[in-house]
Every structure is written in structure tokens, then in C-alpha cells.
Regions:
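Catalytic glycan-binding domains that act on GlcNAc-containing polysaccharides
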Residues: 2-187
Length: 187
């Protein structure tokens, strides 16, 4: 197979040099047809940054895996937003911190969720099975949503930095759910 870095460099070069919206749309469609959500997002981002109306490629809706939820799931839009931001829908990515797969699940998080929901923990499947990755992440995000009273800001910080860090920030900076604190300032 192709080296992922070379493919992304190719997309970047095309995104910056192709002259027409139609050419960029064709490249993004090709990436999508090849199942390369990350490539589609990258080309879409380059196109939008250059003023082209290709938002459907910058914000695709077809690359989130189907999964069997462990509990009442979070809104699909939240999962799409996290996947787009964290991995650009790349199911094989591992962050410098060790987060894995399409929704960037840490191994310790997977173990916690599996223990809580009494399911087998398969760390290797965080990369090898996008549905498993999504199942684990969705449960963890839904748990954070419930823990923080439905607040999107606190849910996302709890997912990204951990619930302990989020509680620490609440003590240090106050609660953005209160009207006296502007959520943008809190972030």
C-alpha cells in the first residue's frame, strides 16, 4: 500500500494547486469512493479555505462506522464533530499521546468502558475495528454527558482531557453553565 504521509502530501499539493472547484470536487469524490475519509476532509478543507463551496467534503457524513451502542448514544453530530477534528475519519491513526482510531480512544479509556459495561476489552480493535472504536467512544462520551449534566463544553473537555481535569478546571475557573461565566472565556 501507499505510505499515508505521501498520500496526504499529494492531497495537500492538489488542494493548493488545482484551479477549479470542479477539479477539487472530483479529487474529494475520488478520496471518498476509495474510503479515504481523511483525504476527503483534507481536500474539502483546502477547497473551503480557498473560497470554494465544497463544505460537503470538508464535513462529510458517510465515514462514521455503524456500531452497536452500549447505552443510549450521544448525538451522531457530536461523534461526527469529534471524528472530524481528532482523526479526520482516519481509522488507523495513533496520536502522539497514544489515542487510537477514528474517535481517538486512549487504551485506559477503553479498559474503563469495557470494565464498566462488562464487555471484552480488545485494545487492538481500537485500530482494527472502527465500529468497536466508535462503540467504546460513544459510551464514554455519553457517560461524560450525563456526568456533566448535558453540557457540550464539559462533555467534550471530559472526553478530551478526562473528567478529573474537567472537574479541576471547574474548581479553578468556575462553571460555564452559569450565566456569569462566558463559555468562550472558559474554553
Amino acid at each position: 500500500g501507499l505510505d499515508r504521509r505521501n498520500v496526504l502530501a499529494f492531497y495537500r499539493a492538489l488542494g493548493q494547486t488545482l484551479e477549479s472547484e470542479g477539479e477539487l470536487a472530483l479529487m474529494a469524490q475520488l478520496a471518498s469512493l476509495l474510503g479515504d475519509g481523511q483525504g476527503e476532509v483534507r481536500i474539502g478543507k483546502y477547497a473551503v479555505a480557498r473560497g470554494f463551496n465544497l463544505y460537503e467534503f470538508a464535513y462529510p457524513l458517510q465515514h462514521l462506522p455503524k456500531y452497536d451502542p452500549l447505552r443510549d448514544p450521544v448525538e451522531e453530530a457530536m461523534l461526527f464533530a469529534i471524528a472530524r477534528q481528532e482523526s479526520e475519519f482516519n481509522t488507523e491513526i495513533v496520536s502522539r499521546a497514544g489515542a487510537r482510531g477514528v474517535l481517538q480512544v486512549m487504551q485506559i479509556t477503553a479498559r474503563h468502558v469495557c470494565r464498566q459495561y462488562r464487555i471484552q476489552c480488545r485494545i487492538e480493535d481500537l485500530l482494527e475495528d472502527p465500529s468497536y472504536n466508535t462503540r467504546i467512544a460513544s459510551a464514554y462520551i455519553a457517560d461524560r454527558r450525563d456526568e456533566f449534566g448535558g453540557s457540550y463544553i464539559l462533555t467534550l473537555t471530559g472526553f478530551n482531557a478526562g473528567p478529573g481535569r474537567t472537574r479541576q478546571w471547574l474548581r479553578q475557573m468556575g462553571d460555564p453553565r452559569r450565566s456569569a461565566i462566558d463559555p468562550f472565556d472558559w474554553i
